[in-house]
């Protein structure tokens, strides 16, 4: 489906480092329990529940029970969510979900049904079911979310630092050099960046590299070339961080997208 990625996985000892997604995340837990940090909270999701993550929201992930967890996940594009919100709720602007975990067995079954329709090659059913579950979740747990646009002086420095790292991703400056370029101190920049984006600059940069590598893989670039293009030293370096954030190695991710 255009604008949508799907992942069906079981993890036992897997631990996702703090990362973000450009898309939304609907993760229907079918077995076990997933635990994850969302903001300052540690939350848990089990069978019949859905983990909901808004775009650009730092979060982690690990097993909440010794048996690990199994889930079926949908990653819908923000534009798709906005269009459905506009059609069903007349919501405009920054739309998102207000809770990281919701207890809704019917919606969880709809997420599974989206996967099964896609696996069967039934694009019409998959798209219809996706819109149905999205509208349901938006009606019960959606709303306008606060804009992340920084306003304070420190936050403006953080935004400028982020823009520099985005532009010079393959050859970024040190924290000291970056702070000097922005006319602030390294410690002040570190504190402002963490406050604005939920993680320090070096963690954000790794996450941003993975996100850009994912787009390059979607465009057909081989993993080794994608690794160099985003500033990783080599493909194993990309493999390690990509798997920590996405859950599968870049080669497996790309093969799954080509099916």
Briefly describe each language-model feature range.
Residues 60-64, 140-141, 194:
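Sigma70-family region 2
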Residues 122-130, 171-174, 222-223:
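Hydrophobic alpha-helical connector segments
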Residues 87-148:
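Amphipathic alpha-helical segments enriched in hydrophobic/aromatic residues interleaved with Lys/Arg
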Residues 1-93:
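N-terminal regulatory/effector-sensing and dimerization cores
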């Amino acid at each position: 489906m255009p604008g949508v990625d799907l992942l069906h996985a079981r993890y036992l000892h897997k631990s996702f480092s703090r990362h973000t997604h450009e898309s939304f995340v609907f993760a229907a837990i079918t077995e076990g329990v997933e635990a994850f940090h969302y903001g300052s909270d540690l939350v848990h999701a089990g069978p019949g529940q859905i983990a909901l993550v808004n775009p650009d929201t730092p979060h982690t992930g690990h097993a909440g029970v010794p048996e690990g967890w199994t889930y079926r996940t949908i990653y819908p594009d923000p534009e798709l969510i906005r269009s459905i919100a506009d059609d069903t709720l007349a919501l405009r602007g920054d739309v998102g979900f207000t809770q990281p975990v919701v207890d809704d067995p019917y919606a969880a079954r709809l997420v599974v049904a989206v996967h099964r329709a896609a696996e069967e090659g039934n694009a019409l059913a998959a798209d219809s079911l996706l819109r149905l579950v999205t509208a349901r979740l938006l009606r019960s747990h959606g709303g306008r979310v606060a804009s992340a646009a920084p306003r304070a002086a420190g936050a403006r420095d953080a935004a400028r630092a982020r823009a520099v790292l985005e532009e010079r991703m393959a050859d970024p400056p040190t924290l000291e050099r970056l702070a000097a370029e922005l006319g602030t101190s390294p410690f002040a920049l570190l504190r402002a960046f963490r406050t604005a984006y939920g993680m320090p600059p070096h963690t954000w940069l790794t996450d941003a590299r993975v996100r850009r590598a994912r787009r390059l893989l979607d465009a057909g670039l081989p993993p080794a070339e994608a690794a160099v293009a985003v500033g990783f030293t080599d493909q194993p370096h990309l493999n390690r961080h990509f798997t920590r954030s996405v859950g599968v190695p870049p080669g497996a991710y790309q093969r799954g997208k080509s099916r």
